[in-house]
């Protein structure tokens, strides 16, 4: 059983973040299904009623910041989707934190920081360690 209900990241600029995530989520089959003044919501095409990823203004009214030591791992269907996500992210202003490739554990993944510096790990289905 998957224990995660959804992921939420903070942003001070929903227009820029929406443009970024609209583009990078396309290879993962996630689309924006909600937009309010407070947040954007993204769902997978297989279950468009279930929002899995939110972009929000912080509820405390302070500036959005990234979490030091925090990482969000997203699962792609295959290597091609990992590469496409990474390429789109970089073209939309993300920071490279490790290009896609086979790692020491034998798995294929890469890392970017989004426009608000949240660390995103994009991976194909992994093998056990």
Task: Pin down the residues of each PLM region.
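Single conserved hydrophobic/aromatic residue that forms the stacking wall/gate
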Residues: 120-129
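Vicinal oxygen chelate
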Residues: 11-16, 74-115
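Long, continuous compositionally biased terminal/linker segments
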Residues: 44-77, 81-84
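A short, surface-exposed helix-loop junction/capping segment
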Residues: 1-5
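Exposed loop/turn and edge beta-strand positions of beta-sandwich/beta-sheet ligand-binding modules
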Residues: 36, 68, 106
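Core segments of cupin and vicinal oxygen chelate
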Residues: 8-52
